[in-house]
From Swiss-Prot:
<dbReference type="GO" id="GO:0006220">
    <property type="term" value="P:pyrimidine nucleotide metabolic process"/>
</dbReference>
<keyword id="KW-0547">Nucleotide-binding</keyword>
<dbReference type="InterPro" id="IPR011892">
    <property type="entry name" value="Cyt_kin_arch"/>
</dbReference>
<dbReference type="GO" id="GO:0005737">
    <property type="term" value="C:cytoplasm"/>
</dbReference>
<dbReference type="Pfam" id="PF13189">
    <property type="entry name" value="Cytidylate_kin2"/>
</dbReference>
<dbReference type="GO" id="GO:0005524">
    <property type="term" value="F:ATP binding"/>
</dbReference>
<keyword id="KW-0418">Kinase</keyword>
<protein>
    <recommendedName>
        <fullName>Cytidylate kinase</fullName>
        <ecNumber>2.7.4.25</ecNumber>
    </recommendedName>
</protein>
<comment type="similarity">
    <text>Belongs to the cytidylate kinase family. Type 2 subfamily.</text>
</comment>
<keyword id="KW-0808">Transferase</keyword>
<dbReference type="GO" id="GO:0036430">
    <property type="term" value="F:CMP kinase activity"/>
</dbReference>
<keyword id="KW-0963">Cytoplasm</keyword>
<dbReference type="InterPro" id="IPR011994">
    <property type="entry name" value="Cytidylate_kinase_dom"/>
</dbReference>
<keyword id="KW-0067">ATP-binding</keyword>
<feature type="binding site">
    <location>
        <begin position="7"/>
        <end position="15"/>
    </location>
    <ligand>
        <name>ATP</name>
    </ligand>
</feature>
<dbReference type="InterPro" id="IPR027417">
    <property type="entry name" value="P-loop_NTPase"/>
</dbReference>
<dbReference type="GO" id="GO:0036431">
    <property type="term" value="F:dCMP kinase activity"/>
</dbReference>
Amino acid sequence: MIITIGGLAGTGTTTVARILSERMGIPCVSAGDVFRQMAAERELDILEFSRIAEENPEIDIEIDRRQARLADEHEDLILEGRLSAHFARADLKVLLIAPFDVRAQRISVRESKDIETVREEIRIRERSEAQRYREIHGIDVDDLEVYDIVINTNRFDAEAS
């Protein structure tokens, strides 16, 4: 079974994907894993590669291609990433959501940052990503038609999600 898990920062995609992977006994690959692999292939650290990726949409496109290829090459796999559901063949496409303030609080705790700083960073990041996804891929992030299930992670603890 191929499962994609997507969602905005702070919704718990990485946590849920990891737990599901452990419980189902199938591998999990995140878009972040693919990004780190691509950086290593170029012998760059993550920060250097991130700066390059900001100016080069081909990197985002390659991440999506690689996740789609992984889905095609595996019978059982969990793919975690914001756009995984749009590019990978999957049996189940899951979107995790949570209220803005809940997400901000989770990120604030995880990254030991001031909540107001996190709120502003989220707003900037989400505007930027929505624009990039629209320009690069023609994807409207507010269109949820691609997903089979939408789960509000505010309603459950990570183990229950």
